[in-house]
UniProtKB/Swiss-Prot annotation:
It comes from the Eukaryota. Pathway: Protein modification; protein ubiquitination. Belongs to the RNF8 family. The FHA domain specifically recognizes and binds ATM-phosphorylated MDC1. This is E3 ubiquitin-protein ligase rnf8-B. Residues 169-178 have a biased composition (Basic and acidic residues). HAMAP family: RNF8. Residues 30-84 form the FHA domain.
Length: 532
């Protein structure tokens, strides 16, 4: 099997992912196909009938070169992408690409592609494929012929025409047609693998591909039968011509009555064979028509099923679309209701806010009224600054009442004698908190007044005041202002402090010396004067 000493051997390495190796033993014939009587059985998965029963033959020639022969396969044998003629040996060399069959639809390469290589046996032993058990060379199945054909062949002797060959061809076609018809009309029995029918696994092949392969195979058989019929017609004509020539020259041929009967039987056998071939051809054509009709029916039913499936999918899609639109409408209505509720709530909030603002404005106005009417000093007409409450419960600014008491010791409002002064923190805090809620202008004005009062207090502390009771004594650069008693309604003219600088008087009482009435300077002898 391998070269002696070197350990080299010839083998076929399969192309593709499954790199299996087929060993080519030296001096032996190697057959490949999908049948049982071959060396290596090939089982196509994409197209079950792509490989014939005995597809090709590998053997060595006289120069120990390997050759490949196409055994008239249906889809042919290809050497380096060139198809080989049937029954003709082609020499192979190392690296030659052998392709069995044609590429299936939607594929670029065939399922079975091999490269002839010469490698060590130990190197490829792990990938070797074992041949089928039995003889390496395929043996033909012996068939029993009819008695007439047997007698004719036995009595004829040596002849250029072999009747058993045509009988074998016709029986093969008949068996193939029967097996195809049986496999097409009857389901396969579980656990049984028929030998005459296609012994391949078709679980992974779609029904459409199986039907296509069957129709292709049946068409090829019809063509083979037609070729055999033509061949039989030609041979019958040749036989008749030879027989006619022998009958026309009886002396040369020296035919006796027995020889004439033999020739007649031979012609009759050929005619019977021809009629059988014609019947088988008609039967094959009929079966082919049935297969085509079944294919059309299956395609029509498949198309109808696909249309129904598409209609169901369309109806389901429309139903889902309707449900989706209904759900969207419900969501839209819900969103509109939510938006309306939010708008209503926003409007209510806005109205409440406006009410609160109005109430706040009303409260501020009321606070201003309270500040102007109740928390205002009657002497300076300003809000209390460091409020002081007298024993008579009347309140004044601390600075204002101190300035008043320098002239009189009685309340400017009720004329009750002043006995005590009490600082009122409650009024100060209340006024401060109320002023904080007023406008910034009011806040700044009050802060300026407080600062001014502090400066005035500091100025008085630095410049003391003298009280002179003698009305005839005068000091230079001073004014004498009468402090006559008058009604409480004219408090603005009861107490005046006159200085040379009129700005000081205006800041304190809000008026200048020009506004004083002449009656304010008239005084009795008991009146006292303030000298600044």
């Amino acid at each position: 099997m391998a070269d002696g000493g070197s350990g080299m051997c010839w083998c076929l390495r399969r192309c593709g992912k499954n790199q299996e190796v087929l060993l080519l033993p030296d001096g032996e014939e190697v057959t490949m196909g999908r049948g049982l009587g071959v060396t290596y059985q090939l089982k196509p998965t994409l197209c079950p009938l792509m490989i014939s029963r005995t597809h090709c033959l590998f053997k060595q020639n006289a120069r120990d070169e390997w050759t490949v022969t196409d055994n008239k396969s249906l889809n042919g044998v290809w050497r380096n992408k060139e198809r080989l003629e049937p029954h003709k040996a082609y020499t192979l060399s190392e690296g030659t690409l052998i392709q069995l069959g044609v590429p299936p639809p939607n594929m670029e390469s065939a399922e079975f592609e091999y490269i002839l290589v010469r490698e060590h046996l130990d190197k490829v032993s792990g990938s070797l494929i074992r041949p089928l058990p039995g003889k390496t060379k395929a043996t033909r199945t012996k068939r029993k012929f009819p008695s007439e054909d047997a007698d004719a062949s036995g009595n004829e002797g040596p002849s250029n025409f072999s009747i058993p060959k045509f009988c074998r061809v016709s029986r093969d076609g008949e068996d193939s047609a029967k097996s195809l018809r049986t496999s097409h009309k009857q389901p396969k029995a579980s656990g049984v693998e028929p030998e005459l029918n296609d012994s391949v696994e078709t679980d992974t092949v779609s029904p459409t591909q199986q039907q296509c392969c069957r129709s292709t195979l049946q068409l090829s058989r019809v063509r083979e039968t037609m070729e055999e019929i033509r061949r039989l017609n030609v041979q019958i004509q040749e036989k008749q011509i030879k027989m006619q020539e022998k009958l026309n020259h009886p002396q040369e041929s020296q035919l006796g009555s027995n020889s004439y009967l033999v020739v007649q039987k031979e012609l009759q056998a050929l005619r019977n064979q021809l009629s059988n071939e014609q019947e088988q051809h008609l039967q094959s054509v009929k079966e082919l028509k049935e297969i085509f009709q079944e294919e059309q029916q299956s395609m029509g039913s498949q198309k109808q099923a696909e249309e129904e499936h598409l209609k169901e999918q369309l109806a389901q899609a429309l139903q889902e679309h309707t449900q989706l639109m209904q759900e969207l409408n419900r969501n839209k209505n819900d969103f509109e209701q939510i938006i309306q509720a939010k708008n209503k709530e926003l409007q209510e909030t806005k109205e409440e806010k406006e009410k609160v603002c109005a109430q706040k404005e009303e409260v501020l106005n009321h606070m201003n009224d309270v500040l102007d009417n109740e928390l205002q000093c009657i002497i300076c007409s300003e809000h209390f600054i460091e409020a002081v409450t007298l024993n008579c419960a009347h309140s004044f600014c601390s600075y204002c009442i101190k300035s008043w008491r320098k002239r009189k010791e009685e309340c400017p409002i009720c004329r009750q004698e002043i006995l005590s002064e009490t600082r009122s923190l409650v009024l100060d805090n209340c006024i401060d908190s109320m002023v904080d809620k007023l406008s910034p202008e009011m806040k700044n004005r009050r802060a300026a007044l407080i600062l001014e009062r502090k400066e005035m207090v500091q100025a008085e502390e630095s410049n003391p005041v003298l009280v002179v009771s003698d009305s005839s004594s005068f000091l230079s650069d001073t004014f004498y202002i009468s402090s006559s008693s008058s009604d409480s309604d004219e408090l603005g003219s009861d107490f005046w402090m006159v200085n040379e600088e009129e700005e000081y008087e205006e800041s304190l009482f809000g008026c200048g010396t020009d506004e004083l009435d002449s009656s304010d300077f008239e005084s009795d002898d008991d009146d006292s004067f303030l000298i600044v």
